[in-house]
Amino acid sequence: DDIASLDISETGREILRYHQLTLTTGYDGSYRVEGTVLNQRLCLFHWLRRGFRLCPSFITSQFTPALKSELKRRGIARNFYDDTNLQALVNLCSRRLQKRFESRDIHFLCLYLQYCLLQHHAGITPQFNPLQRRWAESCLEFQVAQEIGRHWQRRALQPVPPDEPLFMALLFS
């Protein structure tokens, strides 16, 4: 228990230093990461990629089922987060960007897009400052990200927040 507490404290210091986020303890003993949506997403990006390298079984047995369960619980149409559809979308991005994604990258991107979809559905979107916005808009990946946004918007009949394609450009860069 002491070792776990030390690990949690060290993780809290690390995410504060690298991601400007704080780890807070709830009344029930649970933990919550607090900070901007952009910083939270970048933190998840970092740790999820790390998780794929260090303990892929945890991602497969814990993270993925919890994410899919939440997508289902929120009533999001299955065709949005279906693995086959998302893999096709990632493969389309790969062709448009002329980038080859390894199978682990495809798995990561599909999971991450599911997470973004969950946040989008909840009305949670990252905010970019003008400098970050200009950088993201200048990337080739931004055009592809806009295409993903149009794809989601056509099927969901719900507008995509303007900063969501900026984040997807960052995700694919």
Question: What spans do the regions from the language model cover?
Answer:
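A cross-family "folded-core" feature that marks the main globular domain of proteins
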Residues: 1-173
